[in-house]
UniProtKB/Swiss-Prot annotation:
Pfam families: HGTP_anticodon, tRNA-synt_His. The gene is hisS. Gene3D superfamilies: Anticodon-binding domain, Bira Bifunctional Protein, Domain 2. This is Histidine--tRNA ligase. It is found in: Cytoplasm.
Length: 424
């Protein structure tokens, strides 16, 4: 039987010439840039399990969300407990925060993760059943400055990676009481149009009418264009918070648009929500986003602490870099390829390879024993910078010839001079 990869997932291999975004050296570059950026902002890594109790996501994400109703990978373990592969990163981080009592260590916790997420979705550009997400969460501060810092972190990452033509959309969805009043006004507006809404939006009319606002259906978009605005229903505290956030973004020179239709897809958000969109991702033009969820910790049985976070898909970041023609890093190649000719030379090369690696010089050695022409061809295929052949003559004289493969230049030196020469 010949096995193939399941639908909706993919392999990340060293170099993928057909679909370059699936090349691991690009992922390594993006992840290293992420780690450098989050540490500049004082965020620390957190890692949580691939699966959690299903109830965690039901309580946090919301029973009426698409994730819970359509997209979760759920199974029963041998103990009869319902478990789910994590569909998003915030709920597991909150669970870990509570369970490990992180609030007792410091009043403000700034955490980040890079991890795979799982959703059973229809395959389309930018959407996969396993996708990889970078997320950050700031727990313990309710200020608009914290909101602005988190948005600045995400925006800075995109800029460091060279992304262009980004649009930051922001909105405030206020408090629960604000949304309760707005929800009724929205339903009153939508009711005469109910039969003209898409089937998804008709289903959401009773359970989660705010989600109709960000429907991608063209007919739905026409209908909600004249709907009441959540911004007209904000309480004074939410209004002040949102106005201050806008001032801070201007201060940071981060361009933004206020989008009153932006509500995000998860039920736990309040006050600030934001989304970054780009035009090169097919049907899905959102590259990342997030918002504030001040009541989530309390809802999960933890302390009543304010929180804000975001998530951004690594697949989408890399695809956008490629689509925008951003200069990409090159794969890592060995600096030196050693070719021994004979058993005695093989012993020397084996020790020499180890010593060079210990000094931080990427080195490979031929173990195949094939003819010299074949080995040189292989060294060229893996794009080695230099090659050295060591045979009986080199063993006797302790002198070698260092050849630069790209130019063909040759340098005479002793074996002892090899490491300092390569370092310089």
């Amino acid at each position: 039987m010949k096995f193939s990869i399941p639908p909706g997932v993919f392999d990340i291999i060293p170099t993928n010439t057909q679909e370059i975004w699936k090349s691991s050296y690009l992922w390594d570059f993006v992840e290293r840039t992420i780690r450098k950026t989050v540490r500049d902002y004082g965020y620390q890594e957190i890692r949580t399990p691939l699966f959690e109790r299903t109830e965690l996501f039901q309580r946090s994400v919301g029973e009426t969300s698409d994730i819970i109703s359509k997209e979760m990978y759920t199974f029963e373990d041998k103990g009869g407990r319902s478990m789910s592969l994590r569909p998003e990163g915030t709920a597991p981080v909150m669970r870990s925060f509570i369970e490990n009592q992180l609030h007792t260590i410091a009043p403000l916790q700034k955490l980040f993760y890079i991890a795979p997420m799982f959703r059973y979705e229809r395959a389309q550009a930018g959407r996969y059943r396993q996708h990889h997400q970078f997320g950050a969460e700031a727990i313990g501060n309710s200020s608009p400055e914290q909101d602005a810092e988190l948005i600045d972190l995400l925006y800075t990452l995109y800029k460091r990676l060279g992304l262009q033509n980004l649009s930051l959309n922001i909105n405030s969805i206020g408090t629960i009481s604000c949304r309760h009043t707005f929800r009724q006004a929205l339903k009153d507006y939508l009711k005469p149009h109910l039969n003209n809404l898409s089937s998804d939006s008709q289903n959401r009319f009773e359970t989660n009418p705010l989600r109709i606002l960000d429907s991608k259906n063209a007919q739905d978009k026409q209908i909600v264009a004249d709907a009441p605005s959540i911004l007209d229903f904000l309480d004074e505290d939410s209004q002040i918070h949102f106005e201050q956030l806008k001032k801070l973004l201007k201060q940071l020179k981060i361009p933004y648009q206020v989008n009153p239709l932006l509500v995000r897809g998860l039920d736990y958000y309040n006050k600030t929500v934001f989304e970054v969109v780009v035009g090169e991702l097919g049907a899905q033009n959102s590259i990342g986003g997030g918002g504030r969820y001040d009541g989530l910790l309390r809802e999960l049985g933890g302390p009543d602490l304010p929180s804000i976070g975001f998530g951004t898909g690594i697949e989408r970041i890399i695809q956008t870099m490629i689509n925008q023609g951003i200069p990409l890093p090159s794969p890592c190649h060995p600096s030196l390829f050693l070719i021994p000719m004979g058993d005695e030379a093989k012993q020397l090369c084996f020790t020499l390879t180890h010593e060079l690696r210990q000094q931080g010089i990427p080195t490979q050695m031929d173990f195949s024993g094939k003819k010299l022409g074949k080995v040189l061809q292989y060294a060229d295929q893996i794009e080695s910078t230099y090659v050295v052949v060591i045979g009986e003559n080199e063993l006797q004289t302790q002198e070698i010839e260092l050849k630069e493969l790209a130019s063909g230049k040759k340098y005479k030196l002793t074996i002892d001079e090899l490491a300092p020469t390569l370092k310089n």
